[in-house]
Amino acid sequence: GLYGDPALRVPMSWTENAKGFSENTPFREVARNIATHNVAAALKDPNSLYHFYATLLNLRKNHPALSIGRYTEIKTAENTLSFQRQTDEESLLILLNYNKESHALSVENLPVGATLLPLYSNDSQPLSLEKTSTQINITLPAQGIQIYQIK
């Protein structure tokens, strides 16, 4: 069986009602934060974890490179993860920052003069490399993720 903190394994809170969508009594005590942390509240909040995952799943569905593309690690900095996913049709750059502060990093070995189109980013503007450059400097938000399509 599973061991650890049983308080972390409480029934899913579908609504702010302790019984959720059921008339039955839950088999375990519900979470203490049920009034604010439930599926109904998450559906209303565009910044919720629900919408974050929905966005990522939609990206994966619409960009096959995320699921079947070749994986190429890019060496950047400590507490960051950077890699490309590529198919014959598409190349994506994925950047993750595990730092609690924003972090500037240099991404190298990109196609000469490439343009990075934001698919998931805090900046909606494309980033362009110099016409003769294969490198770009990007500042990642604290504990953030950015996904770009490389053109």
Q: Which role fits each region the language model picked out?
A:
Residues 93-96, 118-119, 148-149:
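Conserved active-site loop/cleft motifs that coordinate metal ions or position small ligands
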Residues 102-122:
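Beta-strand-rich binding/interaction modules
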Residues 117-135:
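Solvent-exposed beta-strand/loop surfaces of large extracellular or lumenal domains
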Residues 90-91, 124-127, 146:
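Short, surface-exposed beta-strand/loop "edge" segments at domain boundaries and coil↔beta transitions
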Residues 1-104:
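Loop/helix patches that line or flank the sugar-binding groove of alpha-linked glycan CAZymes
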Residues 14-17, 121, 150:
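Active-site donor-binding loop signature of nucleotide-sugar glycosyltransferases
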Residues 89, 112, 141-142:
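Residue-level preference for short coil/turn positions at secondary-structure junctions
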Residues 130-151:
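C-terminal beta-strand-rich structural cap/linker in extracellular carbohydrate-active enzymes
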